[in-house]
């Protein structure tokens, strides 16, 4: 074969392979979120007449109106759906993270904490479904829901399938582990050894299951169905986190070079199918998907895109690391709520840690507001207690009060007009 013919044929094969891969992969390349076409947003049913309401001929549709009332903004903290500071009851390591000799009392103190308007729990699959067939909530979760109802607060929920900080037991139930193959995790390089140490020393986090295995998928669908039957549309539930794999959020598998899948396409197909299962079951309660970059190459970009296009919500587990996440959070469509999880230190406030007069906590709060978050975590990292949270409020009350008033949305009827039309009294709200 002549060299020129060889080069032509090689290029043709490469182009064909690239086109084939493009058709097979659903991966969404990195993009700016501002003006990105995510669709027109959710349809709003039963809306009142949105106007216009001209009052002078020839366009008049109402008689002359008069302003009968105006309102002014309030400095009060107004709890509402879709916004607020979220008190973390459990996070990475279950009730072991609650620093108290009396867990029930500590849970009650956290629920009653006036600083938080919402609550959050993060149990493992094993904790809520140790056996197939039905949910069996542990006592601490039952207590959280009972106290939430008494204190007029709602609960956000994530169920973990991988929890490297649970050292006493695996996150998955035995009935799944016994029937699903597992793949050992491998460090990417020696520089990651220190970061991966806590995972490798825990026998329950040294591996990942073959999520694509038929038995795993069958058990997962049953779990999601049971969760939806219990929580979708439940007035106590504010939101549900989607199941994910990777850098942040579910698993924290970022020190490792491998994942449990044979190839990217299998990983992407598995996780997007699992997201679709959740979207099919949860029609009333919002689902939150993490904006984490796809470090582990499992299809996170497609999951995030489908989440936004289905008018569900997003979340992040950091504020100061990847610029990709800040881009997504800051420029998301206006109908998409965002939760920002950024833990406060587990130790008391340190006056010496301030930089140019700004403490780390105040800096964090300012940047959570900068991205326009709807929710922010009240969480002392791996040192959960109402006392720890209050120590930060007492040290920086102005910052906490400011975010409590500003987070989410503040909507009020500013102008109110009144008119009479054929004997009927009408109001226009603006």
Segments from the language model and where they lie:
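The substrate-binding groove and active-site-proximal loops of carbohydrate-active enzymes
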Residues: 125-135, 204-218, 260-265
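Active-site-adjacent "subsite" loops/lids of carbohydrate-active enzymes
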Residues: 163-226
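A eukaryote-biased signal for short, well-structured alpha-helical docking elements
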Residues: 379-406
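Conserved, mostly hydrophobic/aromatic
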Residues: 119, 227, 240, 429
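Aromatic-lined substrate-binding rim segments of carbohydrate-active enzymes
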Residues: 113, 121-188
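Catalytic-core regions of glycoside hydrolase
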Residues: 37-107, 149-153, 239-389
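N-terminal export signals
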Residues: 5-26
